[in-house]
């Protein structure tokens, strides 16, 4: 199979990379009616599979789960999750032939074998759904021409898809129709109905393309969403220990600091996050972020270039063929890191203390978010897509670190994201360790700035505030956050 993106000519590549339209709410007036009375069969019952299925059923759709025969016979986790929630569960042969929409929500690595198994069983004119387009775009899987291929990609982990739905809301979602597989012209109607059934239409839906979703999703998760958080956690902890900060305190400051800092990001963008700092601390964080932006831009561009060209996917699939040797080795190395094994800290850390004593962490977030956004948009990805794949998802990933540190993050994210995370972090750690960490001390990580007063130069402060607030991600973010003002706020600090 050939990489689908690489089979397109330049004009087609740019057209698909740039496909992005924020859909009006009135386009979802009929909600999920288009799929009512039809049979939806989900393949796979992990976090996305279970939670999307629960939402779709609660929206009035007929949902069942097709699992491998051995998963049913051995009563594996997927079988238990589906059956204990009252769903009909059967083998591929039992359920696929009567399905109107087959939704493939298995891990990326399994997509080729799953599609190969289900496609011969699908009836003429059925639809095949994905929540990530890697199999279509990077692996180049070709689907039978009578089958409609659509995507609905919630921009958060599966657990949040369910929690926001239960609150009467939803999560921002990308939808797409594969241009090679829309024989009846009803792909968009199917995708809209599926998105509405999960609640996504209440939080904002982007009509995108398989190509744009894959290329932006891979970039976001490798760099700011996972890779930067992993690199920052390892480096900040090592620095604090070297400078005499209590190990338990250092571990807690990082573990819960990312979540607390990015909650401000979620509510008001980079502007709100930076405004939580004192004026001297804001200027210091800005300086550090600018230095990191210059230092790390080539690394961000390399990752985007490798994603666009397909080099990243080729390397990862080679590791799949090698029984995930690199993935497992990097996972083991992460588990052995000092931060992952930091002792517990029973003391309380006030919310503001995470900002005051985590100036370097704030700077890392600012630099990483802006670099990811800029690198995506200069590659032809539209600003709205770049926002969702950088700033928007960051608090959701930070929340996983708050639960069980980097282990939890790497368990929750996809296998593709985990591999890309290690690839980026393994390059970012030595780069930052050589050029940034020797220049900083406990004044920006572990303690706080030692200043006699909070006085700063007014002209400099005004200039810095203008730069922060006028960054393109702040402009598009203000509009998109307007659709998400009802999203749950998390408890921070403690």
UniProtKB/Swiss-Prot annotation:
The keyword Oxidoreductase applies. Its cofactor is Mg(2+). It is an enzyme of class 1 (oxidoreductase). GO terms for biological process: isoleucine biosynthetic process; L-valine biosynthetic process. Residues 209-344, 345-487 form the KARI C-terminal knotted domain. The active site is at 132. It catalyses: (2R)-2,3-dihydroxy-3-methylbutanoate + NADP(+) = (2S)-2-acetolactate + NADPH + H(+); (2R,3R)-2,3-dihydroxy-3-methylpentanoate + NADP(+) = (S)-2-ethyl-2-hydroxy-3-oxobutanoate + NADPH + H(+). One of its GO terms (molecular function) is ketol-acid reductoisomerase activity. Pathway: Amino-acid biosynthesis; L-isoleucine biosynthesis; L-isoleucine from 2-oxobutanoate: step 2/4; Amino-acid biosynthesis; L-valine biosynthesis; L-valine from pyruvate: step 2/4. Belongs to the ketol-acid reductoisomerase family. Involved in the biosynthesis of branched-chain amino acids (BCAA). Catalyzes an alkyl-migration followed by a ketol-acid reduction of (S)-2-acetolactate (S2AL) to yield (R)-2,3-dihydroxy-isovalerate. In the isomerase reaction, S2AL is rearranged via a Mg-dependent methyl migration to produce 3-hydroxy-3-methyl-2-ketobutyrate (HMKB). In the reductase reaction, this 2-ketoacid undergoes a metal-dependent reduction by NADPH to yield (R)-2,3-dihydroxy-isovalerate. This is Ketol-acid reductoisomerase (NADP(+)). The gene is ilvC.
């Amino acid at each position: 199979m050939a990489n689908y993106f690489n089979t397109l000519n330049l004009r087609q590549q740019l057209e698909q990379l740039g496909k992005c339209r924020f859909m009006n709410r009135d386009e979802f007036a009929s909600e999920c009616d288009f799929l009512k009375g039809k049979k939806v069969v989900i393949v796979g019952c992990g976090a996305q599979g279970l939670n999307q299925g629960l939402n779709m059923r609660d929206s009035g759709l007929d949902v069942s789960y097709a699992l491998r025969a051995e998963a049913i016979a051995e009563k594996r986790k997927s079988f238990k999750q589906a059956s204990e929630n009252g769903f009909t569960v059967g083998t591929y042969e039992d359920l696929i032939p009567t399905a109107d929409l087959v939704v493939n929500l298995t891990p990326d690595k399994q997509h080729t074998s799953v599609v190969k198994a289900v496609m011969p069983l699908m009836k003429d004119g059925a639809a095949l759904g994905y929540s990530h387009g890697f199999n279509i775009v990077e692996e180049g899987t070709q689907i039978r021409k009578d089958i409609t291929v659509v995507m609905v990609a919630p921009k958060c982990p599966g657990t949040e898809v369910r929690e926001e739905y239960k609150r009467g809301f939803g999560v921002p979602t990308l939808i797409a129709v594969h241009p090679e597989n829309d024989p009846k012209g009803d792909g968009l109607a199917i995708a809209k109905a599926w998105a509405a059934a999960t609640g996504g239409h209440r939080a904002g839906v982007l009509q995108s393309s398989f190509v744009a979703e894959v290329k932006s999703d891979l970039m976001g998760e490798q760099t700011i969403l996972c890779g930067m958080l992993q690199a920052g956690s390892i480096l900040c902890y090592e620095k604090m220990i070297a400078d005499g900060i209590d190990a338990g305190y250092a571990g807690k400051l990082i573990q819960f600091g990312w979540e607390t800092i990015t909650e401000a990001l979620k509510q008001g963008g980079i502007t709100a996050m930076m405004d939580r700092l004192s004026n001297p601390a804001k200027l210091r964080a800005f300086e550090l972020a600018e230095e990191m932006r210059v230092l790390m831009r080539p690394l961000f561009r390399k990752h985007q270039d490798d994603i666009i060209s397909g080099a990243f996917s080729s390397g990862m699939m080679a590791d799949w063929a090698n029984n995930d040797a690199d993935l497992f080795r990097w996972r083991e190395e992460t588990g052995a890191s000092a931060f992952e094994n930091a002792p517990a800290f029973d003391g309380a850390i006030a919310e503001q203390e995470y900002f005051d004593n985590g100036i370097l962490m704030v700077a890392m977030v600012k630099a990483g978010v802006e670099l990811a956004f800029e690198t995506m948009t200069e590659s032809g990805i539209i600003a709205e897509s770049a926002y969702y794949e950088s700033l928007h998802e960051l608090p959701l990933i930070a929340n996983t670190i708050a639960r069980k540190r980097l282990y939890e993050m790497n368990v929750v994210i996809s296998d593709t994201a985990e591999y890309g995370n290690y690839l980026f972090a393994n390059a970012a750690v030595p780069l930052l360790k050589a050029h940034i960490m020797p220049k900083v001390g406990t004044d920006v990580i572990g303690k706080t700035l030692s200043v006699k007063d909070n006085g700063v130069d007014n002209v400099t402060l005004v200039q810095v505030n203008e730069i922060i607030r006028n960054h393109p991600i702040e402009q598009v973010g203000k509009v998109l956050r307007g659709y998400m003002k009802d999203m749950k706020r998390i408890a921070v600090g403690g």
